[in-house]
Amino acid sequence: MSNHTHHFEFKTLKKAWKASKYFIVGLSCLYKLNLKSLVQMALSALAMITLVSLTITAIIYISTGNTKAKPMPTPTIQITQQFQNHTSLPPTEHNHNSTHSPTQGTTSPHTFAVDVTEGTRYYHLTLKTQGGKTKGPPTPHATRKPPISSQKSNPSEIQQDYSDFQILPYVPCNICEGDSACLSLCQDRSESILDKALTTTPKKTPKPMTTKKPTKTSTHHRTSLRNKLYIKTNMTTPPHGLISTAKHNKNQSTVQNPRHTLA
């Protein structure tokens, strides 16, 4: 195509050059014959023709340069994508049927199969091909589901079942008429009030703790004073036995003295 266009342009330029030659020769002949008005008209027409031809050639060259500069589009082929979790499960009948779906050649429409199992999701894309080119749709984001643990399904031994526990309604004793079961369950409002009054204990206000540890100097001073008082009392008050013996000796001396005087 490019060689054909260049050959066509060369032919047109050659014809224009020949026509301009003939036109110049004709103008020179008219100038020799003293026809100045006709010469001026012819020159103005020639100038207009040359300007038009130059603009046309410039447009042609610019268009051809742009076509050469544009790169040719290359065919793009995309590969089928498959998202699969790292922890794969053993194949089962359901998984095998869902993962291995048969394709329908080059004219098969776009299909999207999702297989959801415990903790995993499989995405399979079959792409539509047309004339050797495959175009894939935008790939969806795979959302991982946390694995279901067996501990949640089986309750632990520590947990207790409180379904058997029932709260009995209030039954007054006035309704019961000789029924032992009713009397065992009934309650008097006065008894319940008394029980509550007896069971309620007033809260004790804690006293502020203001204990001061005695210093060594104060304890020593107290003990020294006690020892001094104890020593003084022992020195001033003699024992009872000594006082009685002293009195007895004085009495005997007074009794013996008048005898000596009489003698």
Swiss-Prot record:
Superkingdom field: Viruses
Gene label: G
Listed Pfam families: Glycoprotein_G (PF00802)
Free-text note regarding domains: Contains a linear heparin binding domain essential for virus attachment to the host.
Species: Ovine respiratory syncytial virus (strain WSU 83-1578)
Membrane-spanning intervals of the chain: 38-66
Name the UniProt record assigns to this protein: Major surface glycoprotein G
Intravirion side: 1-37
Annotated Polar residues bias: 98-110, 148-158, 251-263
Residue numbers on the Virion surface membrane side: 67-263
